[in-house]
Amino acid sequence: MIPFVKGWTLTDPKIFIKKDAAYPESPDDIVLSLNKMMVKEAYYKDSGLTINTLCRKTNTNRSYLSRSIHRLYGTNFCDWVNVFRVNEAKKLIEKTDGNFLDLEDLAIQCGFNSVRSFSRVFKARESCTPKQYYRKRMKKKNQMKNL
């Protein structure tokens, strides 16, 4: 369906959306720059990270940032942060040289409050526990060495 304004057909309704003076950047720009900050500054490693902390860093308000993350990634703030944390855990697991890291140390290094929440989130995202993921990676490494 194409929206109408006083007899005119709008093919691009965005041209009539007024930018908010308080937020000159588009929500996508804010979240994408925040994504870069998350990777560069590793904010996700802080177990006390909140959306309010990131709002202060981006000069936005909580609901605006939350909606922007949801619009761009289709997920909530906590799940978005957990993506970074699980990816960090996978990197650390892959860097190990045969000795599996202690789960508690791994969880803390990645920004989780507990081993239980770390394992639950990891399993939900990767369909396996961190130890199962480690075993798969070791098995794959050994197969590559034998080629």
Predicted segments, located by residue:
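Generic hydrophobic, amphipathic alpha-helix propensity
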Residues: 30-33, 82-86
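Intrinsically disordered cytosolic tails
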Residues: 56-59, 70
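Alpha-helical bundle regulatory/interaction domains
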Residues: 1-37, 51, 58-62, 76, ...
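DNA-recognition element of transcription regulators
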Residues: 51, 65, 82
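Short amphipathic alpha-helical segments
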Residues: 84, 88, 102-105, 117
